[in-house]
Amino acid sequence: MLTAIELANQFQASLVGEASTVFNGLAPLERAQSSQISFLSNPLYRKQAADSSAGALIVSKADLEFLQANPGTHSSGRVYFVAKNPYATFARVAQYFARQSAPIYEPGIHSAAVVDPSASIPASCHIGPFVRIGAGVKLGERVAILGNTFVAENCDIASDTLIYPAVSLYFGTQIGERCIIHSGAVIGADGFGFAPDFSATGGEWVKIPQTGNVVIGSDVEIGASTTIDRGAMSDTIIGSGSKIDNQVQIAHNVVVGNCCVIAGCAAISGSTKIGNFCIIGGAANFAGHLTIADRTTVSGNTSIIRSITEPGQHYTGVYPSMLHGAWEKNAAILRGLDKIRQRLRLLDKNKSTES
């Protein structure tokens, strides 16, 4: 375990308090004990932080000044880690403690795995039971592929990527370094492409071969049961640093930029391009062939049916979506619609009486 000063130095925080103190983990403010670290990133919780039993708090400079001026019942002897972004610092400290108890995937190929002789698998990789690895697959160093995962022909998985059980990677899928792919994800299935060929008496939907691949950058996390379809003639691309929640559908030829977050049950239709640093709420949906500007925020359950060209905007609503501020005003009017109706009826009645 690292001492307080070692933690502060490793995570670029200023230390206030005893440098030699050692902590054994993290906990929320209401449950943290003297041997644990918690954090404060929202001024609304300052009073709770002051009264917390936590032995250390990760705080901003402004919150530190408040807590020192307003000490709680357990503040004596507390250590403070002062950071520009307490929430992000908490996340990095949490990663450190999580590594202490994380499973260790020993290098080697399980006897129940089926690996094509042409696959390139470094000795540092872990291949779990009942994994199937196809011809021409290339793995980087320290890749871990857990049980019952299917890796089809010519997939390329870069170093330090972790793939949980029961993931399906179709042929030609490319995955960057340090990615995490959770159970049940299906990457590289055919995109939903069919050409109509109908006449007055019948016809059919003609399948369009999906000959592109899926290309995933580095430091991407993909949630459980998420599906990312392969491109029709060009690739479906997920940019580096993006995080995708559970049960998200990403259709063929979609391009997701770098460092985007996409919450559960969102759906992005074919050939839509999402810019960098976008935030997409749960169950939001996008029509196809749109372009979404960088740093766009889309609220949950919002339907986007037109391209968004101005960066940094926040959209909310269903048919039509609109700027978030306009939606809030309209929602307030909608909540008071019955009162407005009653007032209009009264005005109409008074007008009739006067005439």
Curated annotation (Swiss-Prot):
<feature type="active site" description="Proton acceptor">
    <location>
        <position position="252"/>
    </location>
</feature>
<comment type="similarity">
    <text>Belongs to the transferase hexapeptide repeat family. LpxD subfamily.</text>
</comment>
<dbReference type="GO" id="GO:0016410">
    <property type="term" value="F:N-acyltransferase activity"/>
</dbReference>
<dbReference type="InterPro" id="IPR020573">
    <property type="entry name" value="UDP_GlcNAc_AcTrfase_non-rep"/>
</dbReference>
<dbReference type="InterPro" id="IPR011004">
    <property type="entry name" value="Trimer_LpxA-like_sf"/>
</dbReference>
<keyword id="KW-0443">Lipid metabolism</keyword>
<dbReference type="InterPro" id="IPR007691">
    <property type="entry name" value="LpxD"/>
</dbReference>
<dbReference type="InterPro" id="IPR018357">
    <property type="entry name" value="Hexapep_transf_CS"/>
</dbReference>
<dbReference type="GO" id="GO:0016020">
    <property type="term" value="C:membrane"/>
</dbReference>
<keyword id="KW-0808">Transferase</keyword>
<comment type="function">
    <text>Catalyzes the N-acylation of UDP-3-O-acylglucosamine using 3-hydroxyacyl-ACP as the acyl donor. Is involved in the biosynthesis of lipid A, a phosphorylated glycolipid that anchors the lipopolysaccharide to the outer membrane of the cell.</text>
</comment>
<keyword id="KW-0677">Repeat</keyword>
<dbReference type="GO" id="GO:0009245">
    <property type="term" value="P:lipid A biosynthetic process"/>
</dbReference>
<dbReference type="Pfam" id="PF04613">
    <property type="entry name" value="LpxD"/>
</dbReference>
<keyword id="KW-0444">Lipid biosynthesis</keyword>
<keyword id="KW-0441">Lipid A biosynthesis</keyword>
<dbReference type="InterPro" id="IPR001451">
    <property type="entry name" value="Hexapep"/>
</dbReference>
<keyword id="KW-0012">Acyltransferase</keyword>
<comment type="pathway">
    <text>Bacterial outer membrane biogenesis; LPS lipid A biosynthesis.</text>
</comment>
<comment type="subunit">
    <text>Homotrimer.</text>
</comment>
<dbReference type="Pfam" id="PF00132">
    <property type="entry name" value="Hexapep"/>
</dbReference>
<protein>
    <recommendedName>
        <fullName>UDP-3-O-acylglucosamine N-acyltransferase</fullName>
        <ecNumber>2.3.1.191</ecNumber>
    </recommendedName>
</protein>
